[in-house]
Amino acid sequence: MNSKKKNIETQIVEDFEKIRPAITRLLQTQMNNDNLSLRYGRSKSNSKNDIVINPSILVNTISKTKLDRDEVMIGTVVHEAIHATKNYSLDSESLRNIFQDELDDVEDIEDVLEILTGPFGKYVFDILIHSIEEKIFVKQYEGLNSILKDIYTESFAEIRKLTNFSQYLALLFHSITTYINPEFQNYKKSVVSALNESLHILKTLNYEAVNVSEVVEATVQMIDICKRYNILPDLEKYNLGEQKE
């Protein structure tokens, strides 16, 4: 890490500690969990009640922004905290009713997704779940909604630099959260076509509460769409990348 980023991280640690108690209380209240804790660290926790914010994410975001640093800090921490939690439960019986012959004795959501969608379904599932959770969470706070709208507007152009599948996921997020109205015409035809089909599926989802079975079913449909338009990552390169990590 260069000296500029080291200095930024030192300041970020101080700023994070100032807002941590208030953000923790906000998360505890909205997620109805007094045991939630929020801290700064580089390693994920195995506890669902322990939310860890990676400093590199804050450094990268804050070092690039032209917006108010305190607001960007608050918005980024809330966004990352929502996406780090698993604030939902799996209704195995409901899923088995939908996918009758495929989920015998399967209880874990990651196993369910692997069976039904292969290695990439988890990314679509996560973006759908967390986009809905963020939409539910943020709509109650006009100031927070405004902060996040500014952050996403500033960074929106960066989406074009991503791979096709990552572009698809990012644009799904924006289509659900509606902080901004994403324009699709600047993307490859395959990505735009996959998104346009997926938007019809988004219209069927519940945005007042997370329905896991509904999201799993949507994920299966969206992965099929991604396959048809050939925007999923190359599986061989994906596995090689995992091994390197």
Regions found by a protein language model. Give the residues of each.
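Short, functionally important secondary-structure microenvironments
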Residues: 1-245
